Amino acid sequence: MSTIITTTGFGLTDITKWPLFSQYILLLLMFIGGSAGSTAGGFKVIRAMIIAKIARNQTLASLYPNRILSLHINGSVLDKETQHSVLKYLAVYVLIILSLVTVLSLDNQDLLIVTSAAASTFNNIGPLLGTSDSFAIFSPLSKLIMGFAMIAGRLEIYPLLLLFLPKTWSKT
């Protein structure tokens, strides 16, 4: 279903009738999101590619310690600073998703529903997996938290985090 990875939020089928494995694939696509430069939410395909290549290089480095490895994206070498930036973004992204899942699980919902709600709101996807009731099953507080998650996800985390830095509010 292209609506999941493109984050258009429009679906014509009832996903709850699909096999569970298919729902998990859609959940994975919710986290990856759209392409770089698009207005789609999510972690972005390019960042997922960089993470996969970093993991591959680290595995090869442990197997062949004397081998010199570089990471190439579209024919050009990706410097270490950019790689570290993507890894830091992944850490913040995972921390926020885990925090959302933890808070939303206080509503005593199924883990698939809670994880789907966290991914759907933070990545601005739209559909909710595991239930046909949509977001009506969540408490008002959870809906408020998911609203903030939508804003944080749309802004790609960092601009929102800047609001909490004391340097942002100093008059220097």
Regions found by a protein language model. Name each.
Residues 1-172:
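Membrane-proximal intracellular helices of multi-pass ion channels
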